[in-house]
Amino acid sequence: MARNRDPFTQALASLRDRIHSGALAGGAPVIVQDEAQRLRLSTTPVREALARLSGEGLVERAASGGYVTVRFDATAARDRWAMHAHYVMIAVELNARALGPRRPPAPPFEPDRPIASANRLFSSLVCSAGNRVLWDAFLNVSGQLDLVRRYEAVLFDDLGDEARGLYAAYSRAIRPEFAEAVGRYHDRRMGAAGALAALVFGGAGPPDAGTGGEE
């Protein structure tokens, strides 16, 4: 771990990565003293980082005190995919209203990182809508979905084609083609929410399918 970052940022990045990677499984207690010792920090930045992650919906207060990681069940996954779709579609409408048939430039497509490429396309579109409340809400739910995204390649063998199709639809018309592609993208994930949540709960090691998060 690099030591050139402030303690809070270091603790936040490390804890978020451990949650997203599954090193801290859903429902697991996060022991402040242990995490501080692992990072060679005092407990203060670790507690501050956990408070931030609680606001992001990645940890929650335990009944006995301290924090536990959020357990992601099928309902939670389905609800968050539905909200993610809602935020992207709001951005589609805001951009169409402001720009007409024109579209903000799409980020580069990386064939070997289809999940990350799709995420960046959605993020770019929401960011370009120019609504800070929408952007913050999108980032929050997108960060929570990183818990299940890493397992998509276990269920779907066409992630590259799917992401390429999103980019192609976006290049042609934001409405209706891209909007329809966004709907299909989210519908299949909401339909697979139970299976994705089961993979998260089981802690299976996912294959590498370009699962890098927002950049």
Which role fits each region the language model picked out?
Residues 70-130, 165-181:
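All-alpha effector-binding/dimerization core of bacterial HTH-type transcriptional repressors
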